[in-house]
């Protein structure tokens, strides 16, 4: 019979020391914590945790070994009005578990009870935590440490990026191993990608609503166990765990000079609202882990049913420990924080919130690339430009301005220029660098670039919500025909805008983020919220990729890396050599001139050598070039023996870059 000794309140979680396992669990309001050990047949042994130090319950299992299955039952008051929902009938996941065995189905036994505790036992249905102890030979792996000024981010989903790649063996497609395959790495290197940003690879589950419809949470933002690698993206090869496979992928990408950023979810948990499953924090210490209203209800500032209370001292440390685990165990180079405003809630947003202070004080984490999605749906949730130094931020104002300028004719050139210059009014005055602006035209959430040019309306019927989900404010333009089938004249305009938007993105000051597939002409058939589509709608179709567009994109990224004004990560100042703003006659734009003349035409001289010519009108135009000898440059022309230009005639919706002869 297993017996627990007192053990130690540290280290946190389940830790194998070579002789046994030390178990710890935080709960400030529990009356008793019971460790539940399971054998291979699922038989359960319950052992009361013998010691408590502060709010940490702990015990040591002599002779315990890696592979031990376990969970917890936590007893205490069931008093929803005070925020307490303890229920020992529910087996609970360790919030720090580093591996889980099993899946969470749509099972009524997970119900914890709304006003009264549900007494059905959930142990048989719940995945079991696994104690793991996996050493790994990193073979001298070092982070690529790409300067922010040279960073080009590529946002991708593990499965969506690799599932249909013809040069990756079928048994590896859709997995972490596929990320390490030479064919995938060659694509990233050919494009010029410096940083791969992966949608969540933390252990996530499918909401009951989706399971009832036969769908899944494809994006992975419904995280249950943030310390655990999701096994759904593992190849299942014998002897290779999901953790090892992810490590192999990171090591291979690092060897190719490519950074890896993980999209992490700490704004809410998979327990959803009061009617959701009791799986972890709700049953461990609901009042400590979640933001609650005065009457004990969940403060749903995320739109996902609950919001994690990241300003609580223990919850803050839980996040810091989790990030350090991913950094140390998987050598990741940074993190993108979903609904990042929640990180700073106290409950109002505060730049000096405990989690921000803890990140800044941690030498290892503060050296990582940290990216925030700067909003949630709560009061005061929109915080673009307000995150502390050390963070970069997804810039939706850049996105909407560039779409509006090129596709709708609704944005004047002054607004275009302000956002082309890394949205300087948002970031420069607050002491941030240009790289703080994560520029994007598209992201996983919304239309793909091609769909932006083919659909005026969203087409999300496959999501099972009668097309109610997804944004209606897309700033798109189908050029007179809804859908992918259109005549040659419409496609000519679409392709011109496709290249114009890519050029704008990759030659703007700030940090560009390219959505995987946009360089290939990937379409989701007008679905702008494909979060539950784990199928060919979201998987990149490499066989039909637009090869010319891929070459065009790669040429743009190479061009970007040559222009000091874009790579030095310093603000452009009036009169310096970084930028000159010119009108269609090649003359400097005065303050008054910005508001006069055609608002969709502009010339931008970068680093005194590269001239960006912009015609966002729906008609051809002629521009007079500034003094000097100008010639075409890839991907806009061939410089060898090229004609020296004094004027440029640009078709509708076009952008071009010329280079000045030495």
Curated annotation (Swiss-Prot):
Keywords: Carbohydrate metabolism, Glycogen metabolism, Glycosidase, Hydrolase. The active site is at residues 338, 373. It catalyses: Hydrolysis of (1->6)-alpha-D-glucosidic linkages to branches with degrees of polymerization of three or four glucose residues in limit dextrin. One of its GO terms (molecular function) is hydrolase activity, hydrolyzing O-glycosyl compounds. Pfam families: CBM_48, GlgX_C. The keyword Ligase does not apply. InterPro entries: GlgX_C, GlgX_Isoamylase_N_E_set, Glyco_hydro_13_cat_dom, Glyco_hydro_13_N, Glyco_hydro_b, Glycogen_debranch_bac, Glycogen_debranch_GlgX, Glycoside_hydrolase_SF. Its EC number is 3.2.1.196. GO terms for biological process: glycogen catabolic process. The record marks 445 as: Transition state stabilizer. It is an enzyme of class 3 (hydrolase). Pathway: Glycan degradation; glycogen degradation. The keyword Hydrolase applies. SUPFAM superfamilies: (Trans)glycosidases, E set domains, Glycosyl hydrolase domain. Removes maltotriose and maltotetraose chains that are attached by 1,6-alpha-linkage to the limit dextrin main chain, generating a debranched limit dextrin. HAMAP family: GlgX (MF_01248). Belongs to the glycosyl hydrolase 13 family. This is Glycogen debranching enzyme. It comes from Yersinia pseudotuberculosis serotype O:3 (strain YPIII). The gene is glgX.
